Amino acid sequence: MLRTSFQGVARLVRHKALYRSPCLLPRVHLASAFGSSTESLVARFCPEKTDLKDYALPNASWCSDMLSLYQEFLEKTKSGGWIKLPSFKSNRDHIQGLKLPFGLETASDKQDWRLFTRSIQLEGQGYEYVIFFHPSEKKSVCLFQPGPYLEGAPGFAHGGSLAALMDETYSKTAYLAGEGLFTLSLNIKFKNLIPVGSLAVLDIQVEKIEDQKLYMSCIAQSRDKQTVYAKSSGVFLQLQLEEQSQEQ
């Protein structure tokens, strides 16, 4: 009964994530709009020198599975295939020098902006995750260890916490793979609960890019692939970020 109700509550349609989607989808001339290469997007997104804190680094709370699989993927980055993505406290830090189009940037004097999945600052208590991206294959792997502050059913991660991280990983992958910026839809089917403090591996793939949209899929499962936690699909709108003016 718990599983049935869990699956019923978990249906998400038109979930908005990285930024809220505008009501009207702008039409653009595709031949000229999306000229940024994956390499240039990755270079901007992953600065080599920065004073910003990277939250996607190992800490004492990581379980042995999380640590060992992290090391495996870190080794794969040396061959030039995979890239470890840094994770700063806000997406504003990832897109420095750029602004949202159509005046969507909000004006505020608040300084402590935080990405939802980086809002819990205590190590091991909330989201512990790291994303690896493969540019040529347009896919990502996210290693996720939910902490006790993400609990839903006693001892297990809330379904919404997984949904949020799926959307976050989708958004990063969509942007780097094809300048995908807004979540148009996110559909999830939950299969099993994730124990708090354990590792879940999210495999995300760009299925196709068509008609100004990126179509993507994700499966969240245990490291040995014997337990599937959830499957999802997402659609993202391609929308090019604008250069900020020198006066800003």
Swiss-Prot record:
Any keyword Nucleotide-binding?
Answer: no
Gene3D superfamilies assigned = Hotdog Thioesterase
| Protein's cellular compartments | Mitochondrion matrix
Enzyme class, UniProt record, top EC level: hydrolase
> What Gene Ontology terms describe where this protein resides (cellular component)?
mitochondrial matrix; mitochondrion
Signal peptide segment: none
Question: Phenotype on deletion?
Answer: With increasing age, mice develop fatty liver, due to impaired mitochondrial fatty acid metabolism, and impaired remodeling of the mitochondrial lipid cardiolipin. Mitochondria contain increased levels of monolysocardiolipin, and decreased levels of linoleic and linolenic acid. The altered fatty acid metabolism leads to decreased mitochondrial beta-oxidation and ketone body formation. Mitochondria show abnormal, elongated morphology, and their function is impaired.
The record's listing under InterPro entries reads: HotDog_dom_sf, Thioestr_dom
Gene Ontology biological process terms from the UniProt entry: fatty acid metabolic process; long-chain fatty-acyl-CoA metabolic process
> Any idea which UniProt keywords this protein has?
Fatty acid metabolism, Hydrolase, Lipid metabolism, Mitochondrion
Active-site residues per Swiss-Prot or TrEMBL entry: 167 (proton donor/acceptor)
Similarity remark: Belongs to the THEM4/THEM5 thioesterase family.
PANTHER family hit by this protein: ACYL-COENZYME A THIOESTERASE THEM5 (PTHR47362:SF1)
Q: What is this protein called?
A: Acyl-coenzyme A thioesterase THEM5
Q: Which organism is it from?
A: Mus musculus
